[in-house]
């Protein structure tokens, strides 16, 4: 990541009374502004929000969630579009996830796979899709209550093992605004605080997902190296089923290393702080 620029905290998946959320657009925006967020995208189902800026300076990216399929047998795909300059040419009768991705991109936005663990998406099916900008590795509203599958790390690893390394994003997917708001965010490293710079950084993959801690992952001389805010545990994930250096535990950890095995093709990292909050890097190709 670039050294210059600014770090900006954002949420790019949330709902209001315009679809299945329980608060108004105005209240949803206010909740995140009070929580200190720098940017958000309101992503109601099949209702595109507009780009803007609040009086307090929080950036509003345009957004929408396009969902298809009701059962795993049919295939459940929820795809979030962010930053579209025009309305994607899509109807609610659409059945193709690939066409949704294509139309989001054609409208100037980025397409994000939402909560793949919740949707029980298979890595093999998603590997056939093209044009995704990233996937949610953690989705707050998919946690208890009312759901039970918030974490998609296994999916990310299975997909990366097939050679598809999707950047990892964090999102609240807020509906109730009780337990599911301002929990898991995306931290974007942008050249400045502007709509254009945020979208540029997202497209470049200059971000990580977090509930609070910071994380940076590099590969140096046969090792994966993490730099982070003070942590209780650092975990390394890859396509090796066994690596005896993949976990570092202690107090106030700010750096950790994992020896890479000759056959590993990717690595990613997670940081856990003393409160149990996590930060998630994206997977990095090592060969």
Task: Tell where the protein language model's regions lie, with residue ranges.
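A metal-dependent hydrolase metal-coordination microenvironment
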Residues: 1-114, 118-132, 136-158, 169-171, ...
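C-terminal functional module detector
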Residues: 1-7, 163-167, 174-287
């Amino acid at each position: 990541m670039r050294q210059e620029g600014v770090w900006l905290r954002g949420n790019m998946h949330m709902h209001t009374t315009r679809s299945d959320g329980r608060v108004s657009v105005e209240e949803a925006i206010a909740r995140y502004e009070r929580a200190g967020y720098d940017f958000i995208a309101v992503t109601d189902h099949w209702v595109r929000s507009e780009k803007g800026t609040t009086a307090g300076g929080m950036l509003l990216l345009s957004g929408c969630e396009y969902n298809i399929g009701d059962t795993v047998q049919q295939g459940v795909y929820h795809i979030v579009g962010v930053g579209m300059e025009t309305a994607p040419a899509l109807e609610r009768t659409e059945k193709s996830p690939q066409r949704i991705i294509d139309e989001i991109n054609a409208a100037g936005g980025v397409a994000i796979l939402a909560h793949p663990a919740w949707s029980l998406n298979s890595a093999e099916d998603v590997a056939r899709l093209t044009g995704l900008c990233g996937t949610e590795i953690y989705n707050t509203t998919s946690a208890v209550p009312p759901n039970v599958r918030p974490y998609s790390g296994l999916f990310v690893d299975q997909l990366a093992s097939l050679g598809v390394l999707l950047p990892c994003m964090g999102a609240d997917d807020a509906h109730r605004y009780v337990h599911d708001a301002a929990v898991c965010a995306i931290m974007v490293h942008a050249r400045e605080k502007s709509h254009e710079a945020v979208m540029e950084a997202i497209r470049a993959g200059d971000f990580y997902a977090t509930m609070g801690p910071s994380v940076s992952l590099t590969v140096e001389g046969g090792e994966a190296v993490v730099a982070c805010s003070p942590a209780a545990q650092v975990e390394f994930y890859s396509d090796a089923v066994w690596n005896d250096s993949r976990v570092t535990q202690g107090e106030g950890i700010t750096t950790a290393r994992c020896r890479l095995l000759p056959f590993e093709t990717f690595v990613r990292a997670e940081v856990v702080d003393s409160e149990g909050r996590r930060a998630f890097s994206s997977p990095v190709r090592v060969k």
